Structures are given as structure tokens and as C-alpha cells.
Amino acid sequence: RIVAMADTHNRHAGLAVPDGDVLIHAGDLTGRGSLPELDQVAEWLRSLPHPHKVVVAGNHDFALQRNPVAARALFHGLTFLEDSEATLAGLRIWGSPWQPWFHDWAFNLRRGGEIDAKWRLIPEGVDVLITHGPPLGFGDLVDRGEKVGCEDLLRHLERVKPRLHLFGHIHEDRGEWQYGPSRLVNCTTSEGELPVTVLDLP
């Protein structure tokens, strides 16, 4: 059982977090991305009973990009993924924090070659893909009626074919979709206002 969340933005204390085998946070743990904020969230995650806990950064989590050595050290006892893989509970899990550039937030890259180079790193055969942002057309609809997901990521989904793709970033379009063999889930909690997502993989 996978328990997933994103976009808690420091508002994690009131969340009801069900039990499961793997707990995943798909980024935007904080509001301003400071080391004290990250430390507080990491401590909270360690207090939860799940045997495996995976974290990917989001665009608000600045210290993980600007001061990565100090920031990552805060996540001892947790699995922090940045364009990297871990096998937990028999699942190959890949995590990546990047999203298409938007107002110079953390982990922003230009659409096309810059961000495509990151998606090319995702290996085929992963069971669970975690990205902070959505692919184009799934969980990416914002209030102004525009789909803002990453078309390059969508193309690599067709190549990688993960069993499960978890993301957040777009608070307005939480939900679940099927794309070929892949189950796509926007697991945002929208600053702690929405419940944590619980998923069973067959």
C-alpha cells in the first residue's frame, strides 16, 4: 500500500496519514524552502510509522537546490530522490523534482531541451515514477482554464510506462487518470486542505 501526498506547504500537522508500506511526498513540503522549515517537515515524516518514506523536492523547496548538502542532511532516515532511484518494498521508484520554468522558482527548467534532458534519465522498468509537476493533459488544469503540464514528460511516460506516476504542484486538479498501462495520480493536499491519497498496486 502506497500513501502519497504533495503540496503540504508546512501545513502537515493536521493531516490524517493512514498506515501503509511506502509513504511518498511528491514535493512542496514547505512554503519558503528554508532549512528550518525542511527540518521541521523531515522530523514529522520520521515520526510516522511507515517502514519506507520517500521524498522529492518541489518548486517551493529552495534550500534543496541552493544548499543541497545541508538540506539533504536533514532527511536522514528518509529516502530523498533527485533524478535517482531506490528499490523499496519490492518496487523500483524513481524521483525527480523538475517542472517547466515558471517565475524562477526552485527546480525550474525551460521546456524542450533543458527539461527533456532530465526526463531522459528516467529508466524503463520503474514501477513508481514521482515528479513534482504533472505531464501535459493530466492533473494540470489551472483556474484560468489552461493545461500547464509538461509535454516532454508526457512523451517520456510513453517510453517508460511506469505502473504508477505520482505528482502534485497543481492544486486545482487533483485526481486519477489512466494513460495506457500507467496510473497517473495528482496527490496534492492543497496546503493540507485535501486528504492524503492511499493507493494499492495490484
Residue spans for each PLM region:
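Binuclear metal-dependent phosphoesterase catalytic core
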Residues: 85-89, 152-160, 164, 171-202
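Active-site-proximal segments of metal-dependent phosphoesterases and phosphodiesterases across multiple
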Residues: 30, 35, 102-103, 125-161
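Binuclear metal-dependent hydrolase catalytic cores centered on His/Asp/Glu-rich metal-binding motifs
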Residues: 91-128, 146-152
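Catalytic metal-binding/acid-base residues of hydrolase active sites
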Residues: 9, 29-30, 59-61, 97-99, ...
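Short amphipathic alpha-helix with an adjacent loop that forms part of the alpha/beta core around
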Residues: 14-19, 87-89, 116-123, 199-201
